[in-house]
UniProtKB/Swiss-Prot annotation:
<comment type="function">
    <text>Involved in the import of threonine and serine into the cell, with the concomitant import of a proton (symport system).</text>
</comment>
<feature type="transmembrane region" description="Helical">
    <location>
        <begin position="22"/>
        <end position="42"/>
    </location>
</feature>
<feature type="transmembrane region" description="Helical">
    <location>
        <begin position="423"/>
        <end position="443"/>
    </location>
</feature>
<keyword id="KW-0472">Membrane</keyword>
<dbReference type="GO" id="GO:0015195">
    <property type="term" value="F:L-threonine transmembrane transporter activity"/>
</dbReference>
<keyword id="KW-0997">Cell inner membrane</keyword>
<dbReference type="GO" id="GO:0006865">
    <property type="term" value="P:amino acid transport"/>
</dbReference>
<keyword id="KW-0769">Symport</keyword>
<feature type="transmembrane region" description="Helical">
    <location>
        <begin position="163"/>
        <end position="183"/>
    </location>
</feature>
<dbReference type="InterPro" id="IPR004694">
    <property type="entry name" value="Hydroxy_aa_transpt"/>
</dbReference>
<dbReference type="Pfam" id="PF03222">
    <property type="entry name" value="Trp_Tyr_perm"/>
</dbReference>
<feature type="transmembrane region" description="Helical">
    <location>
        <begin position="140"/>
        <end position="160"/>
    </location>
</feature>
<feature type="transmembrane region" description="Helical">
    <location>
        <begin position="261"/>
        <end position="281"/>
    </location>
</feature>
<feature type="transmembrane region" description="Helical">
    <location>
        <begin position="389"/>
        <end position="409"/>
    </location>
</feature>
<feature type="transmembrane region" description="Helical">
    <location>
        <begin position="366"/>
        <end position="386"/>
    </location>
</feature>
<dbReference type="InterPro" id="IPR023726">
    <property type="entry name" value="Thr/Ser_transpt_TdcC"/>
</dbReference>
<keyword id="KW-1133">Transmembrane helix</keyword>
Length: 443
């Protein structure tokens, strides 16, 4: 074998699938599987069998193409170690950097409000239905839970980072286990309700409107955009010097594809299992009660008459506990991102970017008071969580995940090779449909 053949063989071996690629695949997958998944079955199952089948067809393309577009934007910067803010500043100047900072902050902060409402409702339904205690004052419960989380975050952040990272996989395993364990309780209610003669494409409860609203919850639930920038930087530092940027882009796409397949498989199986166990009417009731599907399942099994199986008794208590842990995990992870983003905004606009004028401790205190205070107000007001996701959370995520990369592909010379592709049209349409939910909610 010649020397050149040996070099090619060595490079091929080194560039094949690595352990770090598997780690990142699981990391992206784990980032997306959080509390948002607990609301997807409610919205997906709300319209019955036909809409959720259409969502199943759309799920992987939405997850893969949208995140690949964001990854391509992150890859387009000249500095392999540059994050998305630096890349956007390189393409669009300082104004672009400010815009991306605002987008990141406002993409994450509403999620904290959503989780504040969710954890309050989940705790209250567990307190009243599973433990059998008298109802508590909502404002007190929300304040207690937020102060408890603030205390843990303030005094044990490093420990909680480790604990939360360990909880990702038990939570995913519990979702799969619950999905499998629900199979004996599946019924044909959702199939029996399918009447092809009375199906409507348009109208408030039509298939198109249901799928349109479902796209928003998919963008919200199938979202690992907060970690994409770090993921791309890691892969560029690992591959780009030896194998080039095109190879790195293909490797990132491959990892995103596998993570998306895992994510869609777990979430859609969980959604279908919940729908076949319950019914569209049950999903509508869960939406009205403003609780995650696990809490509704707990109440559903608690209300069962006759002899209960061990699983039914276990799920009656375990489902709400799993939901509480999942929400806390998601709240904590998003809190750190919100804190970092708000600190940057306060420093930039309150102290003109001069870090010597204010200590990190003071910045953290100012930001924590605003974050926890605003979250308490929203949790006390108790807006409908799915409406909040569709009107605020998902549209802001879509502007960052879908429309920003498409605008960059249109304007940035380094992304010119991606212009004129059908998947760009798909990503743009998904982004616009998600943002148009705001208009739909207003009217």
């Amino acid at each position: 074998m010649s020397t050149s053949d040996s070099i090619v063989s060595s490079q091929t071996k080194q560039s094949s699938w690595r352990k770090s690629d598997t780690t990142w695949t699981l990391g992206l997958f784990g980032t997306a599987i959080g509390a948002g998944v607990l609301f997807f079955p409610i919205r997906a199952g709300f319209g019955g069998l036909i809409p959720i089948l259409l969502m199943l067809v759309l799920a992987y393309p939405i997850a893969f193409y949208c995140h690949r577009a964001l990854a391509r934007l992150c890859l387009s910067g000249s500095n392999p170690s540059g994050n998305i803010t630096e890349t956007v500043e390189e393409h669009f100047g300082k104004t672009g950097g400010v815009v991306i900072t605002f987008l990141y902050f406002f993409a994450i902060c509403p999620l904290l409000w959503i989780y504040g409402v969710t954890i309050t409702n989940t705790f209250m339904t567990f307190w009243e239905n599973q433990l059998g205690f008298a109802p508590l004052n909502r404002g007190f419960v929300a304040l207690f839970l937020l102060l408890l989380m603030a205390f843990v975050i303030w005094f044990g952040k490093d420990l909680m980072v480790k604990v939360m990272s360990y909880l990702v996989w038990p939570f995913i395993a519990s979702l799969v286990l619950i999905s499998l364990s629900l199979i004996p309780y599946w019924n044909s209610a959702v199939i029996d309700q399918v009447d092809l003669g009375s199906l409507s494409l348009t109208g408030h409860d039509g298939i198109l409107i249901t799928v349109w609203l479902g796209i928003s919850i998919m963008v919200f639930s199938f979202n690992f955009s907060p970690i994409v920038s770090s993921f791309v930087v890691s892969k560029r530092e690992e591959y780009e010097k030896d194998f080039g940027r095109d190879f790195t882009e293909r490797k990132c796409s491959q990892i995103i594809s596998r993570a998306s397949m895992l994510m869609v498989a777990v979430v859609m199986f969980f959604a279908f299992s919940c729908l076949f166990t319950l019914s569209p009417a049950n999903m509508a009731e869960a939406k009205a009660q403003n609780i995650p599907v696990l809490s509704y399942l707990a109440n559903h099994f608690a209300s069962m008459t006759g002899t209960k199986t061990t699983f039914a008794i276990t799920l009656e208590y375990a489902a709400s506990i799993i939901a509480l842990v999942a929400i806390f995990k998601s709240f904590f992870g998003h809190y750190l991102g919100t804190l970092e983003g708000l600190n940057g905004l306060v420093l930039k606009f309150g102290y003109k970017g001069d870090k010597t004028k204010v200590s990190l401790g003071k910045l953290n205190t100012i930001s924590m008071i605003f974050i926890m205070g605003s979250t308490w107000v929203v949790a006390y007001a108790n807006p409908n969580i799915l409406d909040l996701i569709e009107a605020m959370g998902a549209p802001i995520i879509a502007s960052l995940l879908c429309l920003l990369p498409m605008y960059a592909i249109r304007k940035a010379p380094s992304l010119a090779k991606y212009r004129g592709r059908l998947d760009n049209v798909f990503v743009t349409v998904i982004g616009l449909l998600t943002i148009l939910n705001i208009v739909y909610k207003l009217f």
